[in-house]
């Protein structure tokens, strides 16, 4: 079982489409019984429900609050088990809630944007489209205080960085992908998206 927050539209307004939201940081807990720290997304998801969408917000593996094994499941492979949980969420929408398999999108920011891009590049055809905000595309260029606890360092473990970085899968892009990134971002560098873009469209 994967903990998640589900937003369901009223039957009379349902359009049969689904959206999966991927929270950021890679370690936050977002499926809980109090006000979401993603309050903007919380309000946006309720708006999407009013427009007929079913929205699923998953505390994928790597998220805190579910024990050591859950938290450390992404060691040496970001975009592995954490992404598999999004794919399981997609199956849940289709098999349990009768969401149209051809009308499912995925989106998120920061780590959520990274997972969005990895989903489209490593599992083409599973999602109709994705929106990736301020996304890491090459973990070797990100803050090593963050990545070294998960992927080690590029010098010591280049394999982990390569299989975890979307830029190495860019040529697989088949689906609709929107990437948005502020040029003044001092956490995830804007250059990450710039480097990925021409590779994706050559």
Task: List the predicted regions and their residue ranges.
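Serine-hydrolase catalytic core recognition
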Residues: 1-201
């Amino acid at each position: 079982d994967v903990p998640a927050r589900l937003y369901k539209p009223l039957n009379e307004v349902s359009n049969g489409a689904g959206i999966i939201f991927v929270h950021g940081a890679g370690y936050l807990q977002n499926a809980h019984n109090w006000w979401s720290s993603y309050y903007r997304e919380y309000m946006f998801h309720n708006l999407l429900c009013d427009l007929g969408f079913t929205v699923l917000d998953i505390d994928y593996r790597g998220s805190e609050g579910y024990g050591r094994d859950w938290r450390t499941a992404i060691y040496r492979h970001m975009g592995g088990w954490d992404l598999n949980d999004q794919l399981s969420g997609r199956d849940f929408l289709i098999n349990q809630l009768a969401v149209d398999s051809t009308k499912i999108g995925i989106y998120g920011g920061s780590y959520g944007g990274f997972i969005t891009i990895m989903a489209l590049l490593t599992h083409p055809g599973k999602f109709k489209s994705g929106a990736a905000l301020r996304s890491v595309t090459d973990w070797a260029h990100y803050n090593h205080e963050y990545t070294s606890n998960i992927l080690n360092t590029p010098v010591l473990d280049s394999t982990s960085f390569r299989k975890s970085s979307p830029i190495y899968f860019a040529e697989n892009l088949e689906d609709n992908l929107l990437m948005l990134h502020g040029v003044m971002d001092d956490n995830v560098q804007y250059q990450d998206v710039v480097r990925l873009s021409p590779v994706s469209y050559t």
